[in-house]
A protein has these predicted regions:
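Glycine-rich His-Gly loop
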Residues: 29-33, 99, 234
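Active-site loop/oxyanion-hole signature of alpha/beta-hydrolase fold enzymes
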Residues: 53-100, 276
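Conserved HGGG/HGGXW glycine-rich cap/lid loop of the alpha/beta-hydrolase fold
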Residues: 7-66, 70
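Conserved hydrolase catalytic core segment
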Residues: 91-135
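Flexible "cap/lid" loop of the alpha/beta hydrolase fold
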Residues: 118-162
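Catalytic active-site module of serine/aspartate enzymes centered on a nucleophile-bearing elbow/loop
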Residues: 253-285
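Conserved loop-alpha-helix segment in the C-terminal half of the alpha/beta-hydrolase fold
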Residues: 219-262
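Alpha/beta-hydrolase
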Residues: 152-227
Length: 285
């Protein structure tokens, strides 16, 4: 693994690469959050066949922090992704996103229309906040009544502490990561979560959206992205199966895979199945 920093708009942005010497079309990974960071586990193993690049977005773990929380925006992150691609001098590339990283990639594709991007891998995608919220509300109805009430009270009052936090963690154990205990790699990444970025862009939890992404919606324009797309989610994913099917129908060239006995972090929960699915897609890219 090699790593370094790129100067993107005056900010130091960390990146790493696995399998740099490989000749197949490289993958560039956009992590989730916003405010999360790169997790090379599992995904770096695709470097057996091609280079795999990761980078931490502004505010995330190994990269610079913004001078002001107002600097965190979809527009900035799209420009940053474009800057990373230019700085690394890719001619052809496959973009892989996780959760918010999928929305970032989708925004980049629709705004910049890059000819260099040959395919997309979108795992547990956030592409429409309204559809995301539809999934969350459906999941919440299946929780114990006391937890439903705690979530409703928190959202009504704006107090996201106490019982709201307890309900939130119960929800995460069902729909974000079903492994027990959570793996060290996830705990380490969560320890580095930048809440300034997360709360500015998203909100206090995965199912309560109060930030800049509240009205985010690429769904009406997905038909404009005509390259091959692989969509994945877990069968218990907070990014729901029904919504994934809606996205598949919207993209002109999309296939989807639902990973069994898994949730939002299905690449960590079921790594062997995830690798088989992605490698099958990559055979033709």
């Amino acid at each position: 693994m090699d790593e370094g920093y790129l100067d993107i708009g005056g900010n130091k942005i960390w990146y790493s690469v696995y399998g740099k010497e490989k000749k197949n079309t490289p993958i560039l990974v956009a992590h989730g959050g916003p405010g999360f960071s790169s997790m090379p586990e599992v995904v770096s193993e695709f470097a057996e066949q091609r280079p795999v690049y990761f980078y931490d977005q502004l505010g995330s773990r190994r990269s610079d922090k913004a001078k002001s929380k107002d600097d965190y925006s979809v527009e900035y992150f799209v420009a940053e992704l474009e800057g990373v691609i230019k700085a690394l001098q890719f001619t052809d590339i496959i973009l892989m996103g996780f959760s918010w990283g999928c929305g970032l990639i989708g925004s980049y594709m629709l705004e910049k229309k890059p000819a260099s991007v040959k395919a997309l891998i979108l795992s547990a995608p956030l592409l429409s906040t309204s559809l995301w919220d539809r999934d969350q509300r459906e999941h919440i109805t299946k929780m114990p009544s006391a937890m439903i009430k705690a979530i409703e009270n928190g959202e009504r009052s704006g107090d996201y502490t106490g019982e709201y936090q307890t309900a939130m963690m119960a929800y995460y154990n069902r729909h974000v990561c079903r492994l027990n205990p959570w793996p060290d790699s996830l705990l380490e990444a969560l320890d580095g979560l930048n809440m300034d970025v997360y709360q500015t862009m998203w909100g206090p939890s995965e199912f309560t959206v109060t930030g800049k992404l509240k009205d985010f919606d690429l769904y009406p324009r997905l038909h404009e992205i005509t390259i091959p797309v692989l969509l994945t989610c877990g069968d218990n994913d907070e990014a729901g199966v029904k919504t994934l099917k809606d996205f598949q129908m919207a993209f002109p060239q999309a296939q989807m895979a639902v990973i069994p006995n898994a949730s939002h972090l299905h690449q960590i929960e079921q790594p062997q199945i995830y690798k088989i699915v992605v490698n099958e897609f990559l055979k033709n890219q």
